[in-house]
Amino acid sequence: KILFPITTIIIMEAFINKMRKLKGIRKLILIEEAWKAIASANMADYIKYLYKTVRKYFGEAIVVTQEVEDIISSPIVKESIINNSDCKILLDQRKYLNKFDSIQNLLGLTDKERSQILSINMANHPGRKYKEVFFSLGGTQSAVYATEVSLEEYYTFTTEESEKMELFALADKLGGNLELA
């Protein structure tokens, strides 16, 4: 609890120093599980500063979170992230169907983009295993794409605990060989 904000600030400060020194080189910082950082007012202020500054130095900031609510519920970062994000990537948002009007307004989505987002994974081909994802580029282009991964890629990135346990049990039976499992 104490080390998380300290470690995060050290990493982000190192990025900001590099960002300022490396001229003409594209820089990127990706903040995974951003909800943890956004939950802290000090960290949220830091992310706001980062978003307002990074583009001036040929850089990009990306926040990844499972809930749109994490971003829109933070008054500190909400406007800076949304106003400085030319690219929006959204997965299935059906669980927000009842409050999608406010999400649409906040993200500045057109009715076409709203329809695209709410169509995600609604009519997937039954014979194929894929998930759909929405991309919007600067509000001028948007589309829904299918992403299909190999079984190996799926098991590498799945967060389903039961699937991971099954995979590790099979690997144990095969002498610890995850590739064979």
What are these regions (language model features)?
Residues K1-S115, L151:
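Conserved P-loop NTPase motor cores
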Residues K1-K21, I120-A181:
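Conserved P-loop NTPase motor module
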